[in-house]
UniProtKB/Swiss-Prot annotation:
GO terms for molecular function: DNA-binding transcription factor activity, RNA polymerase II-specific; RNA polymerase II cis-regulatory region sequence-specific DNA binding. Residues 118-192 form the POU-specific domain. Signal peptide: none annotated. Keywords: DNA-binding, Homeobox, Nucleus, Transcription, Transcription regulation. It is found in: Nucleus. Residues 1-25 are annotated as: Disordered. Residues 210-269 bind DNA. This is POU domain, class 5, transcription factor 2. SUPFAM superfamilies: Homeodomain-like, lambda repressor-like DNA-binding domains. Transcription factor that binds preferentially to the octamer motif (5'-ATGTTAAT-3'). May exert a regulatory function in meiotic events that are required for terminal differentiation of male germ cell. InterPro entries: HD, Homeodomain-like_sf, Lambda_DNA-bd_dom_sf, POU, POU_dom, POU_domain_TF. Expressed in skeletal and cardiac muscles, brain, heart and lung. Little or no detectable expression found in pancreas, kidney, liver or placenta.
Amino acid sequence: MAGHRPSNHFCPLPGSGGGGPRGPMPLRVDTLTWLSTQAAPGRVMVWPAVRPGICPGPDVWRIPLGPLPHEFRGWIAPCRPRLGASEAGDWLRRPSEGALPGPYIALRSIPKLPPPEDISGILKELQQLAKELRQKRLSLGYSQADVGIAVGALFGKVLSQTTICRFEAQQLSVANMWKLRPLLKKWLKEVEAENLLGLCKMEMILQQSGKWRRASRERRIGNSLEKFFQRCPKPTPQQISHIAGCLQLQKDVVRVWFYNRSKMGSRPTNDASPREIVGTAGPPCPGAPVCFHLGLGLPVDIPHYTRLYSAGVAHSSAPATTLGLLRF
């Protein structure tokens, strides 16, 4: 019978009627046959290739493998729709009634633990924890993202800013909040105990995370400026002001970046580089109205403005040093 795969035919478990135990019922056998229950209580299916063994426990039945009222076909035991208690008593015995000769199947029923009847205490504890977390975070000056990173630095599981936000607002399910409870309680304990080693480690991680965020923002700003440059290599002062407002930069930074980028010519920039070289300011460009996208918004038409400088003239007073983008 090797090679046969179990199908979805089930057989009712004798003695497990409507009032019987519910939940998972692991079964062990002393032959290469395995009976395991599925989602529906009181149903068993035969599985192959399990080593001999008997489940310990007080609730055990021994079923003889001799002449059973079921006919095994392959690995499946088709059963009659119903089996009364009197019929089951003829071939189902308790171990206390005496050992059965020959091979047998030992069945152990493990009832499913009932859910807690009253979860009001759990809800109160989670509400109190969320309140304490928010108060302690604000008193220390940490952001929600800092708390998530600090939890990861201390306990190896980084939590997102959204997760911390929803936990404080109690917008997560009770099950998810209960899973996060140990980590957040440990973090509060570390902070309140003023563990110097743990706090130093946490501060180092937060500083490194701040550097990563700044570098990511610089890359994003550099890519946006490069897109603006491809549409208008020499923007007017009004265009520079608009770009600076969109990217939340100073106008001088944008103006210097465009002039320095024009000096680089058509050399492609490296998107992975977190910095762009900036230098002195250059003349704005004349010409017809220019249409280009500002960030993620709609295309904006910038009208033509009169030329203020002659070609090739730059501010001599502007510093010619190499600067990076401003840090935020």
